[in-house]
Amino acid sequence: MASGWTHRLLLLAAVVTLGATPIAAASMEYLVTAPGYLTPNADIKITAVVTNPSSAGQLKVDLWGTRSGIQPEQHSSGKSDVRRWRSRY
């Protein structure tokens, strides 16, 4: 379950996208640095990737983050981020 701050970031990304993204748009990325808010005494870089599937009126929000001590998930692109949360709006 996402923390309160994480839930707010996901909702903010979704609301911003609702106002600015046409139905068939590609992914948009939001970069946020949130020191101490998601994890005490930590500086975590997070990226919310918001997609608006052409099939209909909902947004998919994936929140990725990097920080030491978390085993990264390897992607085919070689990116080593950790997906923290996923929500649909």
From Swiss-Prot:
Record flagged with keyword Signal: yes
Keywords: Antibiotic, Antimicrobial, Fungicide, Signal
Region span, Disordered: 68-89
Gene Ontology biological process terms, A to Z: defense response to fungus; defense response to Gram-negative bacterium; defense response to Gram-positive bacterium; killing of cells of another organism
Secretion signal span: 1-26
Intrachain disulfide bonds: none
Basic and acidic residues composition bias: residue spans: 76-89
Propeptide: 27-57
Record's function text: Has antifungal activity against C.albicans. Has antibacterial activity against the Gram-positive bacterium S.aureus and the Gram-negative bacterium E.coli. Lacks hemolytic activity against rabbit erythrocytes.
Official protein name in the record: Ixosin-B
